[in-house]
Amino acid sequence: MDSTVPSALELPQRLALNPRESPRSPEEEEPHLLSSLAAVQTLASVIRPCYGPHGRQKFLVTMKGETVCTGCATAILRALELEHPAAWLLREAGQTQAENSGDGTAFVVLLTEALLEQAEQLLKAGLPRPQLREAYATATAEVLATLPSLAIQSLGPLEDPSWALHSVMNTHTLSPMDHLTKLVAHACWAIKELDGSFKPERVGVCALPGGTLEDSCLLPGLAISGKLCGQMATVLSGARVALFACPFGPAHPNAPATARLSSPADLAQFSKGSDQLLEKQVGQLAAAGINVAVVLGEVDEETLTLADKYGIVVIQARSWMEIIYLSEVLDTPLLPRLLPPQRPGKCQRVYRQELGDGLAVVFEWECTGTPALTVVLRGATTQGLRSAEQAVYHGIDAYFQLCQDPRLIPGAGATEMALAKMLSDKGSRLEGPSGPAFLAFAWALKYLPKTLAENAGLAVSDVMAEMSGVHQGGNLLMGVGTEGIINVAQEGVWDTLIVKAQGFRAVAEVVLQLVTVDEIVVAKKSPTHQEIWNPDSKKTKKHPPPVETKKILGLNN
């Protein structure tokens, strides 16, 4: 080994102080060796208070000016305006984790931050970047190899999945989820295929304002919170559906146009031509066998009268999400004009279902391969409905993961503490750079249950000391609860193995990439010929650079 590289015995001594336990004053603060660390720390500081079942909510103001109260890390990451490339990379990893596994976004962000902080200390201790990267990769492989041995529970093929979904759904809402968990478990169980496969798209979710969460129920088919327009409200058999992303009425072209009318006769002719065009369009829909039209736009009264004349049920969708989901389920395109689709959607019947003071429109099938059940959510506030809807989707995703791999591991930070103990034991015996890297990885893993305890309002040092002692004694089922440490088996707090493993892979990919980055170089465009020679331009430069320059990006707080 090179003489400039500290020995394996020197590194642990130089890493004795955890960076979180040795605060510095601003004057004493050293520059980061990892250029991406500050950006990752800032991003994690936004997500950290939302981690776990006791995480706090945030008022999120979107680009459209809409205010949303949420504790969902995925929604927060999606709404943030980021400039730093490392923050972009971490957000992409978190969103990929959510899309592929349905959960674990905050886990990815926080563990990445903790590992990079430990990597910074290893670099300051003199460990070269290539050896650090190799040691971290070895530790990740050790974690992934050990993880299946912690799976002490498994969902049976004929078992009610409520107990397995309970902790997943309760993590993402402030309301009690017992009733909703049973509904989701029933829906998932009912549409599970005989071969054990499960299609998440066969479970619909419909949110109706009004009532309470206990009023939520299951409806057969696919239900949406659309508005029925006109006199036609039901198709009892042979429904053929067309979807339109436009007003149900006269077209409104984007380009402005002015009709030049010189006499009352011209005005009458213009109005007559418009009416004839609308009647022709509605007649074409009826001739193609369309008896249900779902529109995302305004509904014209005269056009609605024509639809009643031809026996067409007109439904006004309330959101893009509903009509896009209908397009996917019915396998019919979303049309920009009132034209018959080449492939209309088909279902057995369409009818309205009254639920207290709410109204749902139900599309029902009798054949296989289509949505069988819809979870209809009730709630007094929009924010409460959004939170419940998010919890339902997490439950559906969790059941989908369990159908692929039914194994479950302890939750509430118990798995992270067990893995940290394993890495600490091995790291203390290993020689070379792998030993300190294993110890650093163990420190990073302990950061997750520490965050759970902090968000629960507990005495963090006492909880972590008690958990460490219990895990050292061999009890790997102890995690962080509301009032202290809990036995996760008795409390029923479980995580799916496949989601946790995917989360570790995502974290490893980001960390192994960022530890090799020393600086961020941004190409700067050279000024154009007009900008150079325009004397009135404020950006005029007498001597423009002949080549592109580079700019080192910092973090925009």
Curated annotation (Swiss-Prot):
Question: Which keywords annotate this record?
Answer: ATP-binding, Chaperone, Cytoplasm, Nucleotide-binding
In this chain, the stretch annotated as Disordered covers: 1-33, 531-557
Task: Name the Pfam families on file.
Answer: Cpn60_TCP1
The record's GO molecular-function terms, alphabetically, read: ATP binding; ATP-dependent protein folding chaperone; calcium-activated potassium channel activity; monoatomic anion channel activity; unfolded protein binding
Compartments, as annotated in UniProt: Cytoplasm
Summary of the function given for this chain in its UniProt record: Possible molecular chaperone; assists the folding of proteins upon ATP hydrolysis.
Q: Does the keyword tRNA processing apply?
A: no
- SUPFAM superfamilies, per database record: GroEL apical domain-like, GroEL equatorial domain-like, GroEL-intermediate domain like
Which protein family is it in? Belongs to the TCP-1 chaperonin family.
Q: What else is known?
A: Presence of two highly similar CCT8L genes (CCT8L1P and CCT8L2) in the genomes of human and chimp and of a single copy in other mammal genomes, including rhesus monkey, suggests that the duplication of this gene occurred in the ape lineage (Hominoidea) after its divergence from the old-world monkeys (Cercopithecidae). Expression of CCT8L2 is confirmed by many ESTs mostly identified from the testis.
Name any GO cellular component annotation.
chaperonin-containing T-complex
For this entry, list what GO says about its biological process. protein folding
Its name, as the record gives it, is T-complex protein 1 subunit theta-like 2
The reply on keyword Transcription regulation is no
